[in-house]
Regions:
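Auxiliary tRNA-acceptor-end handling modules of aminoacyl-tRNA synthetases
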Residues: 1-17
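Short secondary-structure transition/capping segments
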Residues: 4, 51-55, 260-262
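N-terminal low-complexity segments that are often proline-rich with Ser/Thr-Pro
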Residues: 297-298
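Short low-complexity, flexible loop/linker segments enriched in glycine and/or proline
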Residues: 54-58, 175-176, 263-266
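Polyanion/phosphate-binding surface patch
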Residues: 40, 44-77
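Acidic, His- and aromatic-enriched active-site or binding-groove loops in soluble protein domains
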Residues: 64-71, 177-196
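Short, conserved secondary-structure transition motifs
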Residues: 163-176
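Positively charged, Gly/Ser-enriched RNA/tRNA-binding surfaces
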Residues: 17-37, 46-47, 64, 74, ...
Length: 298
């Protein structure tokens, strides 16, 4: 009989690391409680359709990384790859989506990725969801929480990158110009990038292909299509919080999930090597229209 060992990318965690994780969770929970957030726990298993409809059919999570299987009733279930979709599903299912909610959670997530330094197939993740609040005030509060994390954990050599993806009209105008620009480069795209071009061209903006990246750097920028109100939000974030953490405006930042609209952000550290991102998020109004007909700013 072959020796039984742990699944690749799913490490055992012993005392030194469990103590560190306990301290980290205690610090994060203290920060979240100081912002009057309430803890929520959702199941590790969800219907696969939830993640297809929320993260997007073109997302890497759905196409490459999700752990799915059929149960005895031939229902497709998945280990959660992220926490947001389950929280939103819970709020809608319990008919709580007509009120405002400030929630936080933490727990194990699962993604079928190539294990490497800083990236595992089972990993712990903490998250914050501000549900039902209008754009602007909640965006500033979420950045305030991020800054508190930077300060409390004394994060060094770290930068907070921000961008704004605009609203539906902004995206449509920008995508129209982007597609015109990309026509001259279409023949140079890889098969994978051609698929992104056909299904979700915004995904090309965070391409790691050097030649494509250089080409896109000279093309249209979404920031040029933003309203004065949207630009003012980015300016306010930089002016209010820039004194506490280093903030960069990154027009290529789109994040990896289809449900983001409006503000997006990502924290990176030069201490982490190639996998330098350790925190990220953004506004996701469209996620509420995926599992539910209700429209709720989130």
């Amino acid at each position: 009989m072959d020796k039984i060992s742990s699944i690749r990318g799913m490490p055992d965690v012993f005392e030194s690391d469990t103590n560190y994780l306990a301290e980290l969770n205690e610090t994060l929970s203290r920060i979240f409680l100081s912002h009057n957030l309430n803890e929520v726990n959702t199941p590790i298993l969800e219907q696969t359709e939830l993640f297809i409809r929320s993260t997007g059919v073109t997302s890497d999570i759905v196409n490459k990384e999700i752990y799915s299987f059929n149960d005895r009733n031939e229902q497709s279930l998945s280990l959660r790859p992220e926490g947001t979709a389950g929280v939103v599903r819970s709020i809608i299912q319990k008919k709580l989506d007509t009120a405002e909610h400030k929630l936080w959670y933490q727990g194990p997530m699962f993604r079928y990725e190539r294990p490497q330094k800083g990236r595992f197939r089972q990993f712990n993740q903490a998250g914050v969801e501000l549900l039902g609040f209008e754009e602007g005030s909640s965006d500033l509060e979420i950045i305030s929480i991020v800054c508190d994390i930077f300060i409390e954990l004394e994060l060094e050599n770290s930068v907070l990158r921000i961008n704004h993806l605009g609203d539906k009209d902004t995206k449509e105008k920008f995508l129209s110009e982007l597609l015109k620009y990309l026509k001259t480069y279409k023949g140079e795209l890889s098969d994978n990038d051609k698929e992104k071009l056909n299904k979700n061209p915004l995904r090309l903006l965070d391409s790691k292909d050097g030649d494509l990246k250089d080409f896109l750097d000279k093309g249209p920028k979404i920031i040029d299509f933003l309203s004065s109100e949207q630009l003012n939000l980015l300016d306010k974030i930089q002016s209010v919080f820039g004194k506490y953490v280093e903030i960069e405006l990154d027009s290529s930042l789109v994040r990896g999930l289809d449900y983001y609209t409006g503000l997006v952000f990502e924290a990176v550290s030069s201490n982490l090597g190639a996998q330098d991102s350790f925190l990220g998020g953004g506004r996701y109004c469209l996620l509420y229209t995926s599992p539910s007909p209700r429209d709720l700013s989130t």
